[in-house]
Amino acid sequence: QMQVFQMITKSQRIFSHAQVSKASSQLPAPEGKPAALRPLQGPWPQQLPPLAPAVDSLNAGPGNPEAEGSPARRRKTTPGVAREASPGNTRRDAKGGLKVAAVPTPLAAPSLDPSRNPDISSLAKQLRSSKGTLDLGDIFPSTGQRQTQLGGEELPGASLPGKQAPAENGAVSGTTKGEKGPPCSRGGGYRLLGNPRAPRFSGFRKEKAKMDMCCAASPSQVAMASFSSAGPPADPSKSKLTIFSRIQGGNIYRLPHPVKEENVAGGGNQQNGGSTDWTEPRSTFICKNCSQMFYTEKGLSSHMCFHSDQWPSPRGKQEPQVFGTEFCKPLRQVLRPEGDRHSPPGAKKPLDSTAAAPLVVPHSIPVVPVTRHVGSMAMEQEKDGEERDSKESSQQRKRKKRPPPKRLFIPPPPSTAGEPGPAGCHQSRLRSPMFLVDRLLKGLFQCSPYTPPPMLSPIREGSGVYFNTLCSTSTQASPDQLISSMLDQVDGSFGICVVKDDTKISIEPHINIGSRFQAEIPELQERSLAGIDEHVASLVWKPWGDMMINPETQDRVTELCNVACSSVMPGGGTNLELALHCLHEAQGNVQVALETLLLRGPHKPPTHLLADYRYTGSDVWTPIEKRLFKKAFYAHKKDFYLIHKTIQTKTVAQCVEYYYIWKKMIKFDCGRAPGLEKRVKREPEEVERTEEKVPCSPRERPSHHPIPELKIKTKSYRRESILSSSPNAGPKRTPEPSGSVESQGIFPCRECERVFDKIKSRNAHMKRHRLQDHVEPIVRVKWPVKPFQLKEEELGADIGPLQW
């Protein structure tokens, strides 16, 4: 023990006993209740006074002219070296205060009278009046008995919750609610807390003292100096950080008066005379709403997030500043300044009105000594904080946070009156002109009719349901406002406004009144006069004679309709409507109607109502037009406008009609030429070779038009079924058993009757016919094709549309 005090005396040579006496004389105990401090037990009670100057010596110098015992001097006092909290001894009393229980030790010594050691009690008062905590474990040994409980009233500055400064080794142990904390990594020492409920001195442990003035201040000292609240009392109107502000991470701590605190921190560093090489210069960020300081952009952004959401205080009052980590138990109470009515009943009001709420400093906070001027510090931080955001954020954050998606904005429906009408009706957004130009000559301006949505305005200029709208890019206008761009000028003398489709016209909903919006109702007449009136419509079909009752007449009419639908008739059998009209003009005579269809055609006088009526398939296509149509179809597929531009003699409607008529007869396949064209263009030697392999005796007939039953065939079309169902349908050969043909090594194709020597060749050839699944061609020319080798134009002309 003597060696320890020799080392203390050697390191504290510059301190005098006069300063100790002066400091102790200015800290009297409160009247009425003596603050009895049971001294530390040990064999060296008379050598404790040199410790008191160590507290004030940290800020001693020409920069602090105040008296050493004054409240201003105590506010600027820098705490000593930080230490860990004691494991297992910190517990919470019934009212939320912290208690430090005394731990009995086997070492016992006679207790000393407190009156014989006035310096120790004054030292305890001075330590408790400081804002930070002082670690005395580096000075006193831990062999003595642990301290006992202090009595009396709380001292000035001690009524606020104490702040636990972090240990230098980064290991801080605490307790959570109702649980004991983990064991301390450094062992025996205990924390001295400025708690108003049960303040106690902690035990001390023996360690190497580092109190020399030439040494650099520890990070804990600078941290407490920079975070000490040396300004006026905290303003209750200013919002403090809540526990909600801590859940996003980052170092978020409130500085009520950052200008004065940073000035004090800078002064303390200069007075200490130590180097600050242990810190790295980093940027600080200040909240523009509540003037709180942050050391990371992440902390500021999370703080601003809760500013925007307006988190309410749980009990409508200021929240205590607590740790967001697992090492410290959050305090339950917040002591208000004097005069606060909302203070908890169990909390004592502080005697010193200038004391501010203490701060909680975690062990991982990066402390930056700031040496800016007092007047320009806040303004410079607001300007420089935004400029350094992009640079510092890329270095401090390891990974970038994915930006959140933009919120969906649904613009409200517009309303001229400020609120929607009944049943949620709103004004129409469809463009309508203000005035009708054709009504201006009457001398009165007539408003345009109201067109409720989704109806389209009948007097619109454009051709679309919705007019073109552009969102405003200015910051003042809301996104749902439309840009009213007048493409034409307004004549102010007459009030005529010719607007375009992208003009927003404000028309209030109203009932359209006038003869233009009302139906013309004729006068009421007798029902007997209705039979005399002639029908306005033209009669184009009427069942004549006994057609409705005679079955034979009905059968003849049915046969006429079947012939009109076959390829016997000009137009490809698409003139069923024409046949019925001819039968009506013949007054039910089927023979006269058939002659009209085949020979004369429907000749109508110019005064007839159907004189200009166009029947389907009545257009005449020349061979050149058919060739151009096929070439254009292979090039442009079903783009009939380009096909019309290629032909130039037929309209788009005529091209579409021609395509769908011939689609039932000849397949237009872009992948390959139609089967009919290939059969026509076969080489003569191939035909002769086929005839030698498959002997046949074709039966010829003058006409090669198939009957109506062969109009449309599916893929399951078989040659044998055609030959059996229609023996006179067209050129064909006698069917032979398939086994006899295949037994001779000949494999014909059942679709196009091409003959192959190998079955694999025929199977590969059959893949070409799989593309044609929808319809089979009507015209199927059978082998041999020698008598029917016609040109493409002649073949198309024979099966073409009507020829009158």
Swiss-Prot record:
Domain ELM2, chain residue ranges per copy: 509-601
Keywords noted in UniProt: Activator, Developmental protein, Differentiation, Meiosis, Metal-binding, Nucleus, Repeat, Repressor, Spermatogenesis, Transcription, Transcription regulation, Zinc, Zinc-finger
Listed transmembrane segments: none
SMART domains: ELM2 (SM01189), SANT (SM00717), ZnF_C2H2 (SM00355)
Superkingdom of the organism of origin: Eukaryota
Compartments (UniProt record): Nucleus
Composition-biased stretches (Basic residues): 396-405
Pfam families, alphabetized: ELM2
Protein name stated in the entry: Zinc finger protein 541
GO molecular function, one term: transcription corepressor activity
Entry annotated with the keyword Nuclease: no
